[in-house]
Amino acid sequence: MKIVISPAKKMQTDGGFLPKSQPVFLDQAEELWSYLHSLDQAGLEKVWRANAKITEEARQMLAADLTQPQLPALFAYSGLQYQYLAADVLDQAGLDYLDQHLRVLSGLYGSLRPFDGIVPYRLEMKSPLPAFKYKSLYEFWGEKVYQELYQDDSVVLNLASKEYSHLLTPFLKEGDRLLEVVFQEEKNGKWRTQATHAKMARGRLVRWLAEGGRDLSDLQGFTDFGYAFAPDQSGEDRVVFRKKA
């Protein structure tokens, strides 16, 4: 089983862990890095969908050398999901579990193992790509990420957003399973996904799996934050957890 999660916009460069490996798709990442280097201020503003001030700040990231990474992917992202995953306080068995099972989907790097070394960057899957030979990052990556994830596993637990899981969904073949995990809360008589709470729950679920060395058969036992497995809403390729607001 593989577990996929989205990256985070917020990144850091300080941490107590060192990279153990280089990204599988480092060559492709360097091609995208070179493309970003080729753009002027106006072009970068389009790609990053940012104003001049934010673009100038983000442009400083491009000085980094992708072959000289600063942190492992698992510790470089610092968004809400990663805060609740809290990998920095997992024991070695938990880290080994993540190294084997977890993958971070990325616009720049495609797919990342937890201890692949990366640098801070800004590039989302839906970023426009002016003056590039590919119309989109989806076209650029094609089947590459799908093939890498499914070459040894037929089951992927999907905790990524639709923006990132679309790296996989168009290419699924017979026998492949992409098991979507959904967190819902009741509000005013309706069940909805609350984005902030869902990010927290995704991070905690990954941690819960790693702490116990758990697999798919254990998934229904997750109850953190008051969530409970909802069998009537779940199916072969969808696991739903619900809680009362």
UniProtKB/Swiss-Prot annotation:
Any Gene Ontology CC annotation: cytosol
Paired cysteines (S-S): none
Gene Ontology biological-process annotations: response to hydroperoxide
Any Pfam family hit: H2O2_YaaD
Protein family according to the UniProt entry: Belongs to the UPF0246 family.
Entry protein name: UPF0246 protein LBUL_1917
Species, as recorded: Lactobacillus delbrueckii subsp. bulgaricus (strain ATCC BAA-365 / Lb-18)
Taxonomic classification: Bacteria, Bacillati, Bacillota, Bacilli, Lactobacillales
